[in-house]
Amino acid sequence: MASLVYGTPWLRVRSLPELAPAFLRRRQSSLFYCSRRSFAVVACSTPVNNGGSVRVRFAPSPTGNLHVGGARTALFNYLFARSKGGKFVLRIEDTDLERSTRESEAAVLQDLSWLGLDWDEGPGVSGDFGPYRQSERNALYKQYAEKLLESGHVYRCFCSSEELVKMKENAKLKQLPPVYTGKWATASDAEIEQELEKGTPFTYRFRVPKEGSLKINDLIRGEVCWNLDTLGDFVVMRSNGQPVYNFCVTVDDATMAISHVIRAEEHLPNTLRQALIYKALKFPMPQFAHVSLILAPDRSKLSKRHGATSVGQYREMGYLPQGMVNYLALLGWGDGTENEFFTLEDLVEKFSIERVNKSGAIFDSTKLRWMNGQHLRALPNEKLTKLVGERWKSAGILTESEGSFVNEAVELLKDGIELVTDSDKVLLNLLSYPLHATLASPEAKPAVEDKLHEVAASLIAAYDSGEIPSALEEGQGAWQKWVKAFGKSLKRKGKSLFMPLRVLLTGKLHGPEMGTSIVLIYKAGSPGIVVPQAGFVSMEERFKILREIDWEALNKDESVPLESTATVST
């Protein structure tokens, strides 16, 4: 809780009304509030008086999508609560009535659920501290605003918008902070009653000591201190009766028995106002922990101009929740080892707020993609195959999402997949046959010069005789046996055998395991496997293209007509 310290002049502090004699607790107590003493509040690291239990909250505003920075804040709160056996509370801060929508709220809830961050209290989950939307707690805010008015911590301010603008302009001319300097902080009862009778609109302003400092002990940043003379009296209730953000947050955190407030460092200025309200309402102070911002590679604040920034966007791009959670956890936290692969359960076990770094964390989309691939390949085969198979069918490549072809294709191609959406490209690449483009490339020249035309002639003869179709029909074992015999007949082995076969049968110089690839290409030619519009080049069509190759022109370094290249249309 916040504490006040009295002593020698350099430690002298200003009395707050709840500590002052009763005769000073009046709205017109101008002498008391005009005293120029110094003031200091220290937020000690002591838990809220809620039985010692840990209660944290994530409080998004439903005005848009869930940003990755917000998702990381939610994750750190979730991990802290779970690691301490505490409660993770979800509160919707929808006081911005013009921008807040239920559609945005639903999207945020969906993103949190997708990440696996289930909340113990909040929308859809009953609890003892509801309601959990700020728009449904207005009566509570008004109750505490009136309490502050009665104690003298806030006062009615009847300044017009024009007057406030003029104050800011004057402060700017004098190169002073734009703090409130209006007369209503020291107005008499008579002056106030006169304005009330006229029906003049007013706000509630919080009295801020004019000198001194406020300190908190942040769990991540250590001691943080502000000079109070830079703040000025701030509004807690607007003229339309709507409470402002800092007032709502303080009342909510206190009445919901929140023990730890873990949030982004951009909220540090809010902590100054909230700490003053805590003390004025005699609320116990929670422990604060302000995490660093997530930065773009150029060290500016991550924004839309840097690409995808919302959880929903990454979900639509094919990222897994496991990969997102793992990567977000490492943006400013580590367990002290070289390990970078964590499941959500691992993170709950190892997380500690003491290991959260106060320096800005760089968001590296390449690293996120790599990490997603690690989690994708760590999935059980059945789950991975289901994900990829459904993707291939929905993308219009395969007619079915399951079966032996899907199983074998996923097993062959999974090392080249980092996102589920990558699976389209790798399968289309397997099904394509860009032979002419490959033969025309400089990289293929050594293979062409190694009597590739002779291997092609022998291969065509073996296909026409039925040897190749027969071996492929029997499967991987029979195909390997045939390749070995074919190599002996040509007196070739190793690279001198396998490279020509890869080029001539797949149309490429590189790719996944050759034998399995060729067997799968043959199987893809069976009826009902590949969607006709997918651009698949069957084994029969490949040999037709092989027969039309002008090997003499190739050996003379003449250009190959690229219009005859067989590729998949994407």
Swiss-Prot record:
The keyword Zinc does not apply. A motif ('KMSKS' region) lies at residues 301-305. Gene3D superfamilies: 1.10.10.350, HUPs (3.40.50.620). It is found in: Plastid, Chloroplast; Mitochondrion. L-glutamate binds at residues 57-59, 93, 245-249, 263. It catalyses: tRNA(Glu) + L-glutamate + ATP = L-glutamyl-tRNA(Glu) + AMP + diphosphate. Keywords: Aminoacyl-tRNA synthetase, ATP-binding, Chloroplast, Ligase, Mitochondrion, Nucleotide-binding, Plastid, Protein biosynthesis, Transit peptide. It comes from Arabidopsis thaliana. The keyword Transmembrane does not apply. GO terms for molecular function: ATP binding; glutamate-tRNA ligase activity; tRNA binding; zinc ion binding. This is Glutamate--tRNA ligase, chloroplastic/mitochondrial. Belongs to the class-I aminoacyl-tRNA synthetase family. Glutamate--tRNA ligase type 1 subfamily. Disruption phenotype: Lethal. In heterozygous plants, aborted ovules. Its main location: plastid. SUPFAM superfamilies: An anticodon-binding domain of class I aminoacyl-tRNA synthetases, Nucleotidylyl transferase. PANTHER family: GLUTAMATE--TRNA LIGASE, GLUTAMATE--TRNA LIGASE, MITOCHONDRIAL-RELATED. One of its GO terms (cellular component) is plastid. ATP binds at residues 67, 266, 301-305. Pfam families: Anticodon_2, tRNA-synt_1c. PROSITE patterns: AA_TRNA_LIGASE_I. Residues 1-39 form a transit peptide. One of its GO terms (biological process) is plant ovule development. A motif ('HIGH' region) lies at residues 60-70.
